Swiss-Prot record:
It comes from Streptococcus mutans serotype c (strain ATCC 700610 / UA159). CDD domains: 5TM_YidC_Alb3. It is a multi-pass membrane protein. A lipid is attached at C21 (N-palmitoyl cysteine). One of its GO terms (cellular component) is plasma membrane. GO terms for biological process: protein insertion into membrane; protein transport. It holds the Pfam family 60KD_IMP. It is found in: Cell membrane. The keyword Transmembrane helix applies. Residues 1-20 form the signal peptide. This is Membrane protein insertase YidC 1. GO terms for molecular function: membrane insertase activity. The keyword Transmembrane applies.
Length: 271
């Protein structure tokens, strides 16, 4: 788990570093491969813009990206659900190998891998959508700050290439990020401290970063996380999962009670 969050942290740090690189204007004549990619993003957004409304183009572009990545996000949700179900067994392994010596750690890692293999779980599946989205976010940021026809666009109360003057988008991005994390972990049988902490820290991080990002990037974040909230409710609804789990537990208890009653009845007949 710690390694996973370390990878997330490194990916975010890389995005921030790379976002600071490259300030020159990107045009259709740019020869650099990355700048061509950035310009392709810009042209795609312009194509999707209705009546020249760049904000609409960014919203439709976000829907397009999220729809393309839908299978990966679905894999992420299913893998996360299986990981949550595995937590009791993983905790049992931690109890079995409490030592910090190299041999204990190796044995615990080996048995953990066997568990993942047994249940068909990839512990890093949840990182795939994030790692794919990082270059998308970077390219979008570069397009909004280095391509003239996007940089000068406007939508509602904001200039697409500048930060939101009223900070509405960063706040919405943080809210939808929190809802997405909360819904993802809602059905977990057990919640560890790291999970709870990340549910709080990640939205705050998004909020603080969003204050200084171009409004277009913040808009992408809002739409992307709102899309994910509805996706979770549609494909992996935690309330339905909890209700189904409760139903199965009630059925198991009822079955156990019937067995006990049958044993008592049989015992009385023998008497």
């Amino acid at each position: 788990m710690k390694k996973k969050y370390r990878i997330i942290g490194l990916a975010v740090a890389a995005l921030l570093f790379l976002s600071a690189c490259g300030r020159s204007q990107v045009t259709s004549h740019s020869s650099d491969a990355w700048e061509k990619f950035v310009y392709f993003f810009a042209e795609t957004i312009r194509f999707l813009s209705i009546n020249g409304r760049i904000g609409i183009g960014i919203i439709l572009f976000t829907f397009l990206i999220r729809t393309i990545l839908l299978p990966l996000f679905n894999l992420q949700l299913k893998s996360g659900q299986k990981m949550q179900e595995l937590q009791p067994e993983l905790k049992a392994l931690q109890t079995k190998y409490p030592g910090k010596d190299r041999e204990s750690r190796m044995r615990m890692a080996e048995e953990s891998q066997e568990l993942y293999k047994k249940y068909g779980v990839n512990p890093y599946a949840s990182l795939f959508p994030l790692l794919i989205q990082m270059p998308v976010l970077w390219a979008l940021y570069q397009a909004l700050t280095r391509v003239e026809f996007l940089k000068t666009g406007s939508f509602l109360w904001m200039d697409i290439g500048n930060k939101d003057p009223y900070f509405i988008l960063p706040v919405l991005a943080a809210i939808f990020t929190f809802l997405s994390s909360w819904l993802t972990n809602k059905a977990a049988k057990e919640r560890n401290g790291m999970m709870i902490t990340m549910n709080i820290i990640l939205p705050i991080f998004i909020l603080l970063i969003g204050f200084n990002l171009a409004s277009g990037v913040a808009l992408y974040w809002v739409v992307s996380n709102a899309y994910q909230v509805f996706q979770i409710l549609l494909l992996n609804n935690p309330f339905k999962i909890i209700a189904e789990r409760q139903r199965l537990e009630d059925e198991a208890r009822e079955l156990e009670a019937k067995k006990r009653r049958a044993k008592k009845k049989a015992h009385k007949k023998r008497k």
